[in-house]
């Protein structure tokens, strides 16, 4: 499915819309793009090549090499010091490696969730919303509520979406798909695509409070992130 290309990667100034097409049928191109805007480095990658973990590792190595070029005398540490890892380990198809025909599959029907609507950009372009959050304050709020930062932010986003729901659709649940790094559940060191997701949804009543949403999201995370459920969902992806 994937073939090696001896094509040099060229860094270019950012141009065009984010997440614009990388894969061009019948044309030999690389499935990733590196660009820059002022002091920001962008790395975009085709979803079949890697996931967020692999992309972040690549970007960190890229930045390290850039800093090494700019500051030759600097002694930068190894980012991922693992002498035992091989190229084959990093290219492993972990979905096939950890698929089990004996494990049960997890498929259940769910009520259609509320669909956000809005004005589309021309030519179906995408836009990016950047949000800077003070980590210490968020961590303190999450800790006080007895939840993780991920659970807290998930509940906050569900609550924010609820505020935009029209009255004629308040009976529909509000759902989010949360990515899950499967390397946390299987002993994989692959930098290839190896992630799944969980679906978190909440129903609202007239007296629903944010604390109720936090409690529901926390319980759903605990259930959906159990090893048995993750293994069943992995089999559905293969």
Predicted segment positions?
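Short amphipathic alpha-helices and their capping loops
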Residues: 1-10, 76-133, 178
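Short hydrophobic beta-strand segments that form the core of ligand-binding sensory/regulatory domains
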Residues: 42-44, 130, 199
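Residue-level signature of the cytosolic catalytic core of signaling kinases
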Residues: 131-134, 145, 206
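Short, flexible turn/loop "capping" segments at secondary-structure junctions
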Residues: 34-37, 119-123, 133-134, 190-194
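Acyl-thioester-dependent acyl-group transfer interface
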Residues: 1, 5-32, 139, 162-238
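Non-catalytic N-terminal regions of enzymes
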Residues: 1-88, 138-143, 148-172
């Amino acid at each position: 499915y994937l073939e090696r290309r001896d094509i040099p990667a060229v860094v270019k100034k950012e141009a065009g819309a984010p997440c614009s097409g990388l894969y061009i049928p019948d044309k030999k191109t690389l499935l990733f793009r590196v660009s820059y805007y002022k002091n920001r480095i962008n790395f975009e990658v085709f979803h079949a090549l890697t996931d967020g973990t692999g992309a972040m590792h690549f970007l960190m190595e890229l930045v390290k090499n850039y800093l090494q070029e700019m500051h030759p005398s600097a002694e930068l540490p190894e980012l991922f010091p693992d002498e035992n890892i091989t190229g084959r380990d990093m290219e492993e198809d972990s979905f096939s490696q950890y698929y089990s025909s004996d494990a049960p599959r997890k498929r259940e029907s769910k009520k259609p969730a509320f669909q956000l609507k809005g004005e589309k950009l021309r030519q179906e372009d995408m836009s990016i919303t950047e949000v800077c959050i003070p980590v210490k304050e968020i961590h303190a709020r999450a800790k006080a509520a007895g939840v993780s930062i991920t659970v807290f932010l998930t509940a906050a986003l569900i609550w924010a979406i609820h505020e935009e729901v029209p009255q004629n659709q308040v009976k529909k649940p509000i759902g989010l798909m949360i990515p899950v790094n499967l390397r946390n559940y299987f002993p994989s060191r692959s930098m290839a695509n190896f992630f799944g997701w969980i679906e978190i949804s909440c129903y609202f009543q007239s007296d629903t409070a944010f604390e109720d949403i936090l409690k529901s999201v926390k319980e759903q995370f605990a259930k959906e992130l159990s090893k048995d459920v993750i293994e069943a969902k992995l089999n559905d992806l293969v």
